Structure formats: structure tokens, C-alpha cells
């Protein structure tokens, strides 16, 4: 199986579905309360961000998922930086509704996406990327067993702003 193949991943806590325009209303509701989160990839316009991620998917560079909990889309996560000639991938552009943060949803989603990458797609390393200032996300990444690999300054974000990333890897 390839990292770019559409797939549904599911466990008792969360379901990861291929992102589609059908998720727009739920995701627009889910982003409420995240206006403060300047350091993460919460989109200003959910429909525009879905369109952007689907264009990246169609170009073979990204495989975006809607994170679904209790029947509603509550966030997004993505395989990105896909290079089918390299046995590694990045997981990023993740954001979750405040109502599911610090619940089992994020950990369950990350375990699904990591398991799929390592087991079904046979990658040897996964990079999880977050903003340096996003301490909550960095702590969650560490709980998954990933270790921080350094700090990258002046990286362009999807919002076309420069940011400082704290990449971590699990292999």
C-alpha cells in the first residue's frame, strides 16, 4: 500500500477518513475557539483549506484525513512531504477542536496514522512536526515515543507565514 492511497483508519476512539468537501460544515464548527492558535495550522476558511489539501493530494504530495469522533469531523491530520522514493513520511498540518483536545482522540488518531505508515506502507521513519511554541502538541508527540530532532527556523507554513518548527521522529 502507498502513503497516497485513500484509506479509512478506525479504532474505538476515532475514525480517520479521506478528507472531502462533505466534512466542511463539521470542520467549520470544530475550529470555533481556535482563533488564539496562531502557532498551528487552523484554517481561516475550511472550504478553501480542504480544496488546497485535495489539490496537494491530487499532486501526490499529501494524503489528508478528517478526524471523526462521535460521528462528526473534529479536526484534520495529514501525511505530507510524501516522496514515494523515500521510506519516510511527515505527519503534520494537524488541528483539533478544543472540545476533543486532551482527550483520547489525538493519541488514538496519531496511533492509527503511525501504525498505518509503519505496518501497511512500510516506512522506516515518521516525522511529526509542530510549531516550537505549541507546547501542548510537543508534549503529546513525546508521549507517542517520538524524540525531538532539533529546531528549524524560518519555515514557511501553509498560511504562507514564517514559523519555527520542532520536528520529532519515530522509527
Question: What residue spans do the PLM features occupy?
Answer:
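Alpha-helical elements of the RecA-like P-loop NTPase motor core of helicases
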Residues: 25, 138-139
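Short Gly/Pro-enriched loop/turn and capping motifs at secondary-structure junctions
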Residues: 133-134, 147, 155
Amino acid at each position: 500500500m502507498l502513503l497516497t492511497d485513500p484509506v479509512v483508519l478506525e479504532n474505538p476512539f476515532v475514525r480517520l477518513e479521506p478528507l472531502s468537501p462533505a466534512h466542511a460544515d463539521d470542520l467549520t464548527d470544530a475550529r470555533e475557539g481556535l482563533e488564539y492558535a496562531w502557532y498551528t495550522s487552523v484554517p481561516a476558511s475550511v472550504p478553501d483549506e480542504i480544496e488546497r489539501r485535495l489539490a496537494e493530494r491530487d499532486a501526490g504530495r499529501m494524503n489528508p484525513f478528517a478526524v471523526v469522533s462521535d460521528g462528526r469531523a473534529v479536526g484534520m491530520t495529514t501525511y505530507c512531504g510524501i516522496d514515494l522514493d523515500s521510506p519516510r513520511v511527515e505527519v503534520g498540518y494537524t488541528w483539533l477542536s478544543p472540545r476533543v483536545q486532551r482527550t483520547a482522540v489525538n493519541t488514538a488518531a496519531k496511533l492509527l496514522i503511525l501504525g498505518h505508515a509503519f505496518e501497511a506502507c512500510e516506512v522506516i521513519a515518521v516525522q511529526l512536526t509542530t510549531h516550537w511554541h505549541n507546547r501542548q502538541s510537543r508534549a503529546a508527540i513525546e508521549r507517542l515515543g517520538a524524540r525531538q530532532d532539533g529546531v528549524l527556523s524560518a519555515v514557511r507554513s501553509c498560511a504562507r507565514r514564517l514559523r519555527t518548527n520542532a520536528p520529532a521522529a519515530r522509527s
